[in-house]
Amino acid sequence: MPTALPAWQSLTQHAESIRATHMRDWFAAPDAEERVRAFTLEAAGLTVDYSKNRITPDTLSQLLQLAEEAGVLTLRDAMLRGERINNTEHRAVLHVALRGRAEHDYRADGEPVMPEVLRVRAQMRDFANRVHSGAWTGHSGRRITDVVNIGIGGSDLGPRMVCRALDHLAVPQVRVHFVSNVDGTDLAETLDHLNPDTTLAIVCSKTFTTLETMANAHSMRRWFVDHGVAESQLKHHFVAVSTNREAVVQFGIDPDNMFTFWDWVGGRFSLWSAVGLSIVLAIGPQQFEAMLDGARAMDRHFATAAPRENLPLILGMLSVWYRGFFDAASACTVPYCAPLELLTDFMQQLEMESNGKSVQRNGAAIDTDTGPIVWGTAGTNGQHAYFQLIHQGSQIVPVDFITTLEPVRNLPGHHAKLLANCFAQGEALLLGRTAEEVRAGGVTDEALVPHMVFEGNRPSTTILMERLDAASLGALIACAEHRTFVQGAVWNINSFDQWGVELGKKLAKPIQAELEGAPASVAHDASTVALIRRAKAAL
């Protein structure tokens, strides 16, 4: 139980001792510049300023002591050795191997994994080169111009986010689209703009049984046939990313066009694997390799850096600090970089599916709050939507600001405005505005003064990249993966299963049968019965 650890008890007292301290006092002190230097880290091309957090040097020491007592780095080392740290599914957790090179000796159950990782990576590279060169064609002999990735969850969110983020690096030969929702509108609106003769589908499902993915795959299959593609020619328009060879063949996809991955790859950690085939097609093998390089640099940092210099460790411990000692129920991610607009969607799955747990690894209930709700949008949009709550709401919401020093697209004057707003929001959250400052600003209506006061003392962290390139994005994502791991390790939960996803899927099957006319096979609550009855009348 993490709350029983001596360091947790000490941090509980420490949090009370500094709770009333305003961060503006720390920044008004003569050693403010030293504080910034001490609480700024650089790793794998990222610069992170975490000085605007409600911590002192003693706080950091105690948080790192908690990490030690919780065995965070011991569990990290076990993960890197390929031990089965996913204890509920009896699996290793080796997404770091997906970034590895031939000289790395990653193993699962004692067996080297790099030969297979490199084989699939080469298969992805060769396939992308064939598509880009026009060597791979559709049934009519025309080159492929559009690729549709059909997947959901980890088979969609990561690749979709990366392709959006690196769109400025996209190859000119193909356009990549994503379909995930079982709502037919998602697929139909995508296909409305495509030519079946020049379209390729990637069916991305580990089991090749995922309801949403297979419904969309079968509908896209019908679309091809309805537009004149013979059944025997569908092999020119479908490839699969899966571990289920039998189901892939049964669907009609040539097994030579199947890209595999392994049970030690969790869905939300899988964009580096064959699940990232859409990424390779979108930006090309060279940029994909650069993304792996950036992630590998962060992996090396996480594995070797001393605790006080270990970026993912410290960021993870800050999350534990606010969730466990300041009752922060949510955390906000705000990328001041429009191409990163889908990063928060990715982070939601990464953190909430990993750490949205209420039992420990041994099955016992945990007696502290775990995974915060992750939310946010791209800045500056968020300033005109929800920043009111972050600045003047009744609860603390730690914010991560993420931006680039160089613009992705350089329109005169735009980037300075973007950076100014990013930095100003962090400063405003830090300092706030007192009643005296409001009055000094010319407000004479005393009834208005309380409404214009900002408490400040709201924590934020700023993550800077020199530019948004494949390597820096790889490092950013790997850092997020590792900080998520750190949180789960402290809470003593298994961050690598997702049993909470299963129950709803199981209950949907008999309801679907009833909606399609079958008699009820299971009992439902009265509300669900009424909803089914109403839906059946409309279908």
From Swiss-Prot:
InterPro entries: G6P_Isomerase, G6P_Isomerase_C, Phosphoglucose_isomerase_CS, SIS_dom_sf, SIS_PGI_1, SIS_PGI_2. It catalyses: alpha-D-glucose 6-phosphate = beta-D-fructose 6-phosphate. The keyword Isomerase applies. The keyword Isomerase applies. It holds the Pfam family PGI. The active site is at 353 (proton donor), 384, 505. Keywords: Cytoplasm, Gluconeogenesis, Glycolysis, Isomerase. It is found in: Cytoplasm. Belongs to the GPI family. HAMAP family: G6P_isomerase (MF_00473). This is Glucose-6-phosphate isomerase. The gene is pgi.
